[in-house]
């Protein structure tokens, strides 16, 4: 479960460097790894069972998760959000609207009033069990939404390393021996432990999974979508309209530039979404695939827009975010891939579960093309 690095200092950008750093800043971190020692992930129980980073090539391999080293070193919480980073974190929705848990009752929907609940920002999850390939966490929470409804819930979060056969079966592929890969799955559950039902009157929560990944000049997010569905292909006005040179769609695939040079966000509705989103970093030749639960026929997704909403259940199923300078400041060189569960319409004692899987592939371009064609319908050469 715990891994040691080589005696020589590791280079920044490698998994070994991040492991050494996190062993100092994050007591109790866990390392899951496969039998070869090449595929590894780091998990922090102190940060909600967050997957901090991963690698496909051992300690000297590329580290895929974005980390906020300065903030992690101090371990200080900050107003609004403590942006520690991490490759996959557990959040709850909705962010905005009358059912929001990020704004207090009666407040204006402005950044000054926006606050991530401490339970999903800086508090620890309880470690239930851990092996070389899986770790299980739990947390009791009490949150209040914008209309004043108190919501009590129990959270279960299981993190599992995926093997080659898991990935072959999941994606319907046959991985070449020349391809290095790391993949993990999180099973995230919320149970209504209160005395009132979660519904359209009292409000509902959703499970919201977000991945912070290292951006580059040549990274492109790609998302397939249903071409025959009704409604806009995507929502792109979260932070103002995304320029055409940064966002386009063609032949059933959305292309969204992820260079951390322009703050922007897109969302895809459940009627348009498919259960995949990913990215390709042409500089490092890394293909990333995220696969998640997308229940057919369920169109009730919480709406995260910062306003009182006409329809608080008309939100997105999948999102992508590109960081950039905002008011002269920037969080870091990262982008995000996000998925959400449907709105949790739960009577007391009932549970909703959402799975999210992240897989990184490195190898010869012809092998990456085979994976990309199978999942996204296009070769990696077109992801630009």
Which ranges hold each PLM region?
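Surface-exposed acidic/polar loop and edge beta-strand patches at domain peripheries
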Residues: 6-185, 189, 193-253, 257-384
């Amino acid at each position: 479960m715990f891994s040691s690095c080589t005696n020589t200092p590791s280079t920044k950008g490698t998994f070994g460097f991040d492991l050494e750093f996190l062993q100092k800043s994050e007591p109790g971190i866990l390392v899951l790894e496969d039998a070869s020692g090449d595929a590894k992930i780091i998990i922090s129980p102190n940060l909600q069972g967050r997957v901090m980073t991963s690698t496909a090539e051992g300690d000297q391999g590329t580290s895929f998760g974005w980390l906020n080293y300065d903030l992690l070193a101090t371990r200080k919480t900050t107003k609004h959000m403590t942006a520690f980073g991490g490759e996959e974190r557990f959040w709850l929705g909705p962010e905005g609207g009358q059912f929001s848990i990020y704004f207090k009752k009666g407040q204006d929907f402005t950044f000054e009033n926006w606050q991530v609940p401490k339970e999903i920002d800086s508090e620890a999850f309880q470690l239930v069990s851990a092996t070389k390939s899986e770790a299980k966490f739990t947390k009791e929470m009490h949150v209040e939404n914008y209309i004043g409804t108190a919501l009590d819930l129990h959270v279960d979060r299981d993190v599992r390393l995926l093997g080659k056969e898991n990935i072959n079966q999941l994606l319907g592929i046959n991985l070449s021996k020349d391809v290095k890969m790391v993949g993990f799955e999180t099973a995230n559950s919320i149970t209504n432990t209160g005395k009132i039902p979660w519904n359209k009157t009292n409000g509902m929560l959703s499970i919201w999974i977000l991945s912070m990944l290292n951006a580059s000049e040549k990274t492109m997010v790609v998302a397939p979508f249903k071409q025959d569905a009704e409604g806009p292909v995507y929502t792109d006005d979260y932070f103002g309209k995304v320029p055409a040179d940064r966002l386009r769609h063609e032949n059933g695939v959305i292309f969204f530039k992820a260079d951390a040079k322009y703050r922007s966000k897109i969302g895809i509705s459940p009627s348009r979404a498919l259960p995949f989103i990913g990215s390709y970093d042409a500089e490092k030749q890394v293909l990333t695939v995220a696969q998640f639960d997308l229940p057919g026929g369920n169109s009730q997704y919480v709406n995260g827009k910062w306003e009182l909403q006409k329809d608080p259940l008309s939100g997105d199923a999948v999102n992508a975010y590109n960081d950039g300078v905002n008011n002269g400041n920037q969080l870091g060189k990262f982008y995000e891939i996000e998925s959400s569960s449907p709105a949790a319409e739960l009577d007391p004692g009932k549970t909703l579960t959402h799975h999210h899987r992240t897989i990184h592939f490195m190898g010869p371009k012809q092998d990456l093309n085979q994976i990309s064609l199978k999942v996204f319908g296009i070769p990696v050469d077109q992801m630009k």
